[in-house]
Structures are given as C-alpha cells and as structure tokens.
C-alpha cells in the first residue's frame, strides 16, 4: 500500500473544485493507495511523473517506490494540465 501525500499546490487546486469533481478526484486518489499505476495512467513525457484522468481533470503525481509514497503535485482541468 502506498502513502498519499498531497502537496500544497495540489491542495489549492482541490479546494477550488466543485463538489462533483472533488468527489470523483478523491475516489481516484484513494485508489492510488492500492495501485500507483492503475490502468489508464500514463507516464509523462519529459518529466518524472504520471497523470491520471478523472473526468475533465488530470491528477499529476510522482511515485516513490522505495518509500511506497505517491506525491500528488497538481490537479488541473485537462485544458490547463500540460502548460
């Protein structure tokens, strides 16, 4: 099982979401505890990170397998996620 760490920029992103998107993203984040590389997640090109779709939003995170931690660093709308 992985420990989930929500970094301050991701917490700010999460705080701005409407209730429905918030609930969907929290479900996805909780699922990362069991599987840090779930089906549908992708390794980011040119970065040390992964992305996971949650409706119109993307959860951007890094995996530390040595310490069994997932660092969530951003939660962005898909149009803003990669800029």
Where are these regions (language model features)?
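Enriched for short, Lys/Arg-rich terminal
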Residues: 1-23, 53-54, 62-83
């Amino acid at each position: 099982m992985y420990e989930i760490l929500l970094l301050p920029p991701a917490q700010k992103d999460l705080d701005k979401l409407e209730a429905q998107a918030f609930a969907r993203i929290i479900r996805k984040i909780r699922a990362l505890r069991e599987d840090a590389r779930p089906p549908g997640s992708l390794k980011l090109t040119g970065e040390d990170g992964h992305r996971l779709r949650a409706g119109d939003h993307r959860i951007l995170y890094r995996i530390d397998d040595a310490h069994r931690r997932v660092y969530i660093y951003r939660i962005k709308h898909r149009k803003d996620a990669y800029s």
